């Protein structure tokens, strides 16, 4: 009876050990991933079992998290798991080959394995927590970059529209000024005379700016008045010299003020003094007439040199007339004398 009871107790112990060993490999398969990682990394075998006062370093979290799934896919069987599988297949041989462990030891092993699993799970939980905070910080930075990038593109370069406006604003004022000055000229009789009218006046100057001076009372342009005053002064100077013609001849305005169509104007040729014709008339027997013609020819040349074109022209006409009279009269006198002399001798 004692032998049979001892055998029964041995059989129960073998069954309990086989159950615990079969449960052990399951726990080992589930929890050996991080444990084997710890075994494969010889530099940190003890640092991966944090106590209550020890915290895992966040620097080594990257390689641990990367190595854990690789080891779980290809678990390596330890000699304990190999022995457990052999014992589960043939419990009788296992009981003969190796002494059966006591139930207290078998219970302590699975109890220690869940502790290891909890520690590894706590480490894995702390690892994503340590790696998680940088992610949200990087996302706002990316959002800030994406928000800050469209700003320079959304703001177009400022256009200078005000540069083209000032000339457009000045045009109406200039037009109004020109219109107002044109009306003033028409009302004040300041409109210049056109060519061929026969009246004295300045030539039109379209490119000259409009004069802002008030027109005179008589309606004549100020330039014409100034030239008239100058001509009066010149005429008075000529009247003072001895041997000069009357002052009335030189007091008239010069023909330079007339238009191109007026006689003696800019369009006409330079007036002639007829001094050669006067010299030829001197050979004729009309001495008082030809001498006067020669004097007028000399005066017309002097007036032309001084700029009095009108006076030179008038004096030239007188010299021409007198010289022609002297020539014709002299020729007639010569013919008459010849006829008389030939008739007397016959």
Swiss-Prot record:
Phosphothreonine-modified residues are: 74, 78
Q: Membrane side Extracellular: which residues?
A: 345-346
Regions that span the bilayer: 324-344
Could you name the domain of life of the organism this protein comes from? Answer: Eukaryota
| Listed GO MF terms | SH3 domain binding; syntaxin-1 binding
Q: Name one GO biological process term.
A: regulation of calcium-dependent activation of synaptic vesicle fusion
Location relative to the cell: Cell membrane; Presynaptic cell membrane; Synapse; Cell projection, Axon
Which protein are we looking at? Proline-rich transmembrane protein 2
Q: Which organism is it from?
A: Mus musculus
| Gene name in the database record | Prrt2
